[in-house]
Amino acid sequence: MYACFAPAIDYDGGKYGIGLLSKKAPVHLQTIALPGREEARALILAEFEDYIYCCTHLSLTEEDRMKSLEILKTFAASYKKPLFLAGDMNAEPESDFIKELQKEFRILSNPRQHTFPAPAPKETIDYVAAFKQNDKGFAVVSSEVVNEPVASDHRPIVVELRTAEKADKIFRTKPYLQNPVGNGMTVMWETTVPAYCWVEYGTDTTQLKRARTIVDGQVVCNNKLHKIRLDDLQPGQKYYYRVCSQEMLLYQAYKKVFGNTARSAFSEFTLPVTGTDSFSAVVFNDLHQHTHTFRALCRQIQDIDYDFVVFNGDCVDDPASHDQATAFISELTEGVRGDCIPTFFMRGNHEIRNAYSIGLRDHFDYVGDKTYGSFNWGDTRIVMLDCGEDKTDDHWVYYDLNDFTQLRNEQVGFLKKELAAKEFKKAKKRILLHHIPLYGNDGKNLCTELWTKLLEKAPFDICLNAHTHKY
């Protein structure tokens, strides 16, 4: 803590005045003399990087308080930052002084809560206020008079404020594309602060539509992880888009306060033409969050014009926290130009482990909202399966918190429907993807007995697996 003091009078061999404690050191400090006929008064003005904070103890005399207010207004008007005023004004809410104060200042504390005398408060003479000229960059989260009757002859006031983040600090990640099926595309990204978000998109950058996520009639907002679906897109058409995030400083039943708005640069994408007979895709697996390996692989494909990317498991392995997951997902999506190229994230056995494993799905928009599924890319049908863990559910290391037997059985039903579907039958080519191969493992594959009879007769052209760390 940093201590600042503005002496007003000599007292008992020392000084008496205004004190200020702050977590950060002020960039500028000033003591301003104020009138007081019974005793001299003072104002301490501390300038910080983003705001000004002033403390004072005004005179008992109305005339002196009015003169002090004029001095305060003059100093406040010289700053462009938010300016806050706190202290003992020696005036009740109905007084002429407070009425004059409120013409230029917005009171942030609750005048209905008495502050004096501390043992049994009957009057409100202490306030926290903000200069109206520059009071747009924050919101009052809470205000209270603390139940402390002993520390001082006045009760302390606590006002919690939330200040607006700068626009260039609002985005935490770049946008990344997900779930490019059904003539649609999902755009995802994260912000550093709770925000109200939308996507602006169109076939050029001058005629833009707006998309938001609306659930049961309400816009999804005041969150940090954002997922917005763009529907009714035309295959083969190039689209431009940018993501927009406006900070939400306050979200209450009858009041919302917004901060600054950040807008990303424009990115572009194109959905595949129905029936196209060729495409390029990149499949990664078992990266195990090895950044150097991933970047080296990206250098090998930097000159390839690929259409989509699949991360076939054990890439965002053992996710311990939201921060850890976000960091490596950003590494992956930015490495493959995920703002322009859609990515599919499939689970391996390691995505299922650790404290944030369940939360990991919030970062993706799975096809059909399942960790398994199927889709068409041109004339090709692509089927993705989720093998779950590589050990039985009753293994001690899972602590009875897994039931992948149910998930594997569920996919038996999915496979039966998929193999009989016209989309699968009419496809010219068929690709199967799953993390753990059905054969060639050191141990027993828990999917083999369930899936083999269905898959061995299915006309897949290629099956791509991972897990074994062997080529």
For the regions a protein language model found, what residue spans apply to each?
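Active-site beta-strand/loop signature of hydrolases that rely on acidic residues for catalysis
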Residues: M1, L21, Y53-T56, I71-I98, ...
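Active-site environment of divalent metal-dependent phosphoester hydrolases
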Residues: Y11-G13, A40, T61-D64, M89-D96, ...
